Amino acid sequence: MQIFAARSSRSVSNNIAKNVFGLVGTELSLVEAEFERQASSNIQVIDYLGEYLRASGGKRVRPALLILANYSVGGTGKGDNVIRLATVMEMLHTATLVHDDIIDNADLRRSRASVNARFGNQTAVLMGDWLYMSAFETTVKERSLEIIDILTRLTRKMTEGELIQLTRIGRLDISESEYFDILRRKTAFLFSACCEVGAILAGADKAEQDALRDYGMDLGIAFQLSDDILDLTAETESLGKAAGSDLLEGKLTLPLIYLLEKEPALKPKLEKIMFDGEYSSLTRDDIKNMLNEHGILVSIKQRADDYAESARKSLDVLSESEYRSCLEEVLVFVTERNK
């Protein structure tokens, strides 16, 4: 029964992905071309690295959200400024991944060698910086102080989130509130900004803008909760990055926070895994089995579903359209995905 349910959820998620990305497929093709343009440089090494990152792909969820949000409140969707800002969001996201991989000493990203693994940390640091600079250079040309303010605050919050998380590395006394603070800063604010900027570019009124901003925030939280489940349950082949890496990198996610509340005697074993950088005292399957025994994975899936439902309710402000429906489908895609 569980296998059937997993396959059913996977099938639903895959079908929704086709619907969502199919609806804005033309626009996302324009984003790919714009990414290539923004990441190009007459400096050979930057040009090469920019193409390496672009070709690494990714789901392009964030630019898709900006475009869908723009359409949902009467925007043009394909307008040059929409495509440019959608690309900016993907570049900011890519920059954070490049820097995250350095910090985490990660070897794999999107099923390819990470930039730091392939080209070294020094090159990766500078390339991440360059991506941030390029993204803001494009944003400034839009001459929108409102959007510049949103992206400046976003970048500050993402950086703060990374710094806060660094101070918690290797610690098992992380509270649930601390976990959610990091989650919002590192993940959810970017989703929120994508939706809000899409609304602004469409000339949305305040109620629509606020609704899409709130939708993006709750969506981002649901996305990360699902990601934390996948880190402990999915395989490397489907994730495109090393499975089970959070604990090995010394990061305590919500499933393990809950598990320690149920099984405090596990603390020395989890500390050893963090210290060794490998599943030595416990296997990943051992942990997954305990999470299932205590109903923790089901509980966190329900939390993700609750945030998704809150996001859906935010959309009630918007007029009915295929784009609003697509934003609702994104919520199912995020909570039912297997990668």
Where are these regions (language model features)?
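All-alpha prenyltransferase/terpene-synthase fold signal
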Residues: 1-339
